[in-house]
């Protein structure tokens, strides 16, 4: 006998499902998982394209069998390295799956799940960086020794025989589990008919009510009776002639003389369980829509073994398992696995989405399993400043998977910018220079199309810089306020101290996460601003201005060129930006979010938090390559976050901002800094007088 081996046929969505399962659930666990295989009878397929084992996109998660399909019981072992894929003991895998079939035959569990006769195993490795999937299917077939041979020419069913058989099989299937559908018993129950061999009249299972028979059944002279294979042992074929008893299987093979691969295991059941050395096999190849075509074929098979004694203990469960084969050959006919490169089929944007997330999700495999990546991904970030700090911060946010980034800047790209600001190039400087905010947003989308990036050309009102166009300034203030309200985190990355004042006020008033970075020549400060805590105001962390004794003012007036420009060591912006984003992500991972207390390094370990400590400020000194972690409380006379400033902003909005910008001492008087300054001066005067009187 020749048999048609299965050919694996994997739907593309399955690879995505496998990748998702590996990244998000299995991680380093390479235990074998259940896999639903499906095969079907397709009369229109060429013989060489038939007998396909289909793996649908939901094969890992669903257990239902679609109408018209037959079930196969599969397992997939997705290993962690390509070396393990190549070096694993494949023979042991095959034998393990074959033994499962052998044991099920011997202990009768095959009767509750005949689809085990169509078991398979898949060895795979998913290269999730390159989206290349290496895999190798094995369809275990237990050898029959000696082999079975055909002792008569294959006999196709007639159209009428096929039609009535299909109806009987369909009726039987409605009452049994899908695991039974692929294998069944069929028996001809004759009415009073003439035997086709000698013309004598035989009474076989006489049907009392001849009127209930269909016209085709009356013409044939018999009816089909269908039952599960377990009924062989309860006498389903009792008193029936051998030529009227058929062991049937759904055969997806379209070769006329080569039945499907599963027949090999079915014949092991016939010999090992039923002790038969001669059997009529029915290759069931008909479908409901074409049931009169008569494609099903009857085979008479015989094993050239000696008479099988049912009492021979060697034929029981103690009999050694026969040889097992079944590894699939590739398209070239070689005994080796296959490789699918999914990048050839995937939408480049979708591929980028999954690749961006890959490295982040790998962190959860071993290093930080409690990392909340969705929280990071869904945080909307507003970057005030699209220059050196803004460019580096944006790139680091992309690396962490942030999808919404908005720039605010009123500057243009100059020729000195591209070498220090990685979102810009030489062409952006031409024609007077592109607007930084707009070009930075466009550059992010060029880097990663999945990001939602936008830019706004706005000027931020600053104390010490009187307003010249009140209507324009008010519109820009309202636009900035709207952006602050729409975002979850504000990154203050502007050039001057006074430019940071209004964003600090807005962020504190709205309870947003405010992240701040500022640079010196070889120093930097990276910090998070505190948020309002009504229940424990004494625990509030300070903002960028909480250590000041004067309100911000025009810091570039009367300054020389080297004082007006941000003159820093070129690498310091990248260092500060990276620390700022890492601090931001640590804040998001803390249960208290922006209200997280300042960590004390010596008292906390990494195990207390998915990413380690959550400091308030990091002050860096590049001259000796050191960092100092600092914590500061909120100051009740702060020019940006004190109670008086918050109340004035919340109650008066633009009118407050306009006065703060235009009136020189307004902020100091409102916050209480003016009074503090006068008090200090009085103390100095008193101290001086006391010193002189003592002398």
From Swiss-Prot:
Domain of life per record: Eukaryota
UniProt entry keywords in alphabetical sequence: Autophagy, Cytoplasm, Protein transport, Transport, Ubl conjugation pathway
Molecular function GO terms recorded: Atg12 activating enzyme activity; Atg8 activating enzyme activity
Residues forming the catalytic site: 565 (glycyl thioester intermediate)
Motif (GXGXXG motif): 385-390
Subcellular location: Cytoplasm; Preautophagosomal structure
Alphabetical list of Pfam families matching this protein: ATG7_N, ThiF
GO biological process, one term: piecemeal microautophagy of the nucleus
Keyword Cytoplasm tagged: yes
Main subcellular location of this protein, as a coarse class: cytoplasm
GO cellular component, one term: phagophore assembly site
InterPro entries cross-referenced by the UniProt entry: Atg7, Atg7_N, Atg7_N_1, Atg7_N_2, ThiF/MoeB/HesA, ThiF_NAD_FAD-bd, Ubiquitin-activating_enz
This protein's domain notes: The GxGxxG motif is important for the function, possibly through binding with ATP.
Protein family membership: Belongs to the ATG7 family.
Role this protein plays: E1-like activating enzyme involved in the 2 ubiquitin-like systems required for cytoplasm to vacuole transport (Cvt) and autophagy. Activates ATG12 for its conjugation with ATG5 and ATG8 for its conjugation with phosphatidylethanolamine. Both systems are needed for the ATG8 association to Cvt vesicles and autophagosomes membranes. Autophagy is essential for maintenance of amino acid levels and protein synthesis under nitrogen starvation.
Subunit structure: Homodimer.
Name of this protein: Ubiquitin-like modifier-activating enzyme ATG7
Species of origin: Ajellomyces capsulatus (strain NAm1 / WU24) (Darling's disease fungus)
Taxonomic lineage from the root: Eukaryota, Fungi, Dikarya, Ascomycota, Pezizomycotina
Gene transcribed to yield this protein: ATG7
């Amino acid at each position: 006998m020749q048999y048609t081996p299965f050919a694996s046929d994997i739907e593309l969505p399955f690879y995505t499902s496998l990748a998702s399962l590996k990244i998000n659930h299995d991680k380093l666990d390479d235990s074998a998982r259940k896999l639903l295989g499906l095969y079907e009878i397709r009369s229109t397929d060429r013989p060489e394209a038939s007998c396909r084992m289909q793996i649908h996109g939901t094969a890992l998660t669903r257990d239902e069998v679609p109408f018209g399909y037959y079930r196969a019981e599969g397992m997939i072992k997705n290993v962690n390295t390509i070396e393990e894929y190549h070096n694993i003991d494949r023979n042991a895998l095959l034998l393990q799956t074959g033994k499962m079939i052998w044991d099920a035959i011997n202990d009768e569990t095959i009767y509750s799940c005949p689809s085990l006769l169509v078991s398979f195993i898949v060895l795979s490795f998913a290269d999730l960086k390159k989206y290349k999937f290496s895999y190798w299917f094995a369809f275990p077939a237990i050898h029959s020794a000696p082999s079975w041979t055909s002792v008569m020419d294959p006999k196709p069913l007639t159209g009428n025989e096929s039609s009535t058989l299909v109806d009987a099989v369909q009726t039987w299937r409605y009452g049994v589990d899908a695991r039974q559908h692929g294998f069944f018993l069929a028996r001809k129950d004759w009415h009073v008919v003439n035997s086709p061999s000698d013309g004598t009249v035989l009474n076989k299972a006489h049907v009392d009510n001849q009127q209930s028979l269909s016209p085709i059944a009356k013409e044939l002279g018999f009816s089909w009776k269908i039952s599960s294979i377990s009924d062989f042992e309860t006498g389903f074929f009792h008193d029936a002639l051998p030529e009227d008893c058929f062991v049937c299987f759904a055969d997806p093979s379209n070769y006329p003389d080569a039945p499907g691969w599963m027949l090999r295991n079915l014949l092991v059941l016939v010999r090992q369980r039923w002790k038969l050395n001669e059997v009529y096999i029915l290759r069931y190849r008909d479908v409901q829509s074409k049931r009169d075509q008569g494609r099903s074929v009857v085979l008479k098979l015989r094993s050239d073994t000696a008479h099988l004694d049912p009492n021979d203990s060697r034929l029981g469960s103690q009999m050694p398992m026969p040889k097992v084969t079944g590894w699939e050959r590739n398209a070239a006919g070689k005994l080796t696995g296959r490789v699918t490169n999914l990048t050839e089929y995937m939408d480049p944007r979708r591929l980028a989405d999954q690749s961006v997330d890959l490295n982040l999700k790998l962190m959860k495999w071993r290093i930080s399993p409690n990392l909340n990546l969705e929280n990071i991904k869904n945080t909307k970030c507003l970057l005030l400043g699209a220059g050196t700090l803004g460019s580096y911060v944006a790139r680091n946010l992309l690396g962490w998977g942030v999808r919404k980034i908005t720039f605010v800047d009123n500057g243009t790209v100059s020729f000195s910018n591209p070498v220090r600001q990685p979102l810009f190039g030489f062409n952006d400087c031409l024609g007077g220079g592109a607007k930084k905010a707009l070009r930075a947003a466009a550059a992010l989308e060029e880097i990663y199309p999945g990001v939602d990036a936008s830019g706004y050309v706005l000027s931020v009102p600053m104390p010490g810089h009187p307003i010249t166009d009140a209507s324009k300034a008010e519109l820009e203030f309202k636009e900035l306020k709207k952006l602050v309200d729409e975002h979850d985190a504000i990154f203050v990355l502007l050039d001057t101290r006074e430019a940071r004042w209004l964003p600090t006020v807005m962020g504190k008033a709205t309870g947003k996460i405010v992240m701040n970075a500022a640079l010196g020549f070889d120093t930097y400060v990276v910090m998070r601003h505190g948020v309002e805590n009504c229940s424990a105001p004494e625990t509030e962390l300070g903002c960028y201005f909480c250590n000041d004794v004067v309100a911000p003012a025009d810091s570039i007036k009367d300054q020389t060129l080297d004082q007006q420009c941000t003159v820093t060591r070129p690498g310091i912006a990248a260092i500060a930006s990276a620390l700022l984003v890492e601090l931001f992500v640590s804040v998001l991972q803390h249960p208290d979010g922006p209200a997280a207390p300042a960590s004390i390094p010596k008292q906390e370990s990494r195990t207390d938090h998915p990413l380690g400590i959550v400091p308030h400020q990091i002050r860096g000194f590049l001259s000796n390559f050191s960092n100092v972690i600092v914590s500061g409380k909120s100051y009740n006379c702060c020019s940006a976050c004190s109670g008086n400033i918050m109340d004035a902003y919340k109650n008066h909005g633009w009118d407050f901002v306009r006065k703060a910008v235009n009136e020189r001492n307004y902020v100091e008087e409102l916050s209480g800094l003016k009074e503090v300054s006068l008090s200090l001066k009085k103390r100095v005067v008193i101290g001086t007088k006391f010193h002189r009187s003592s002398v």
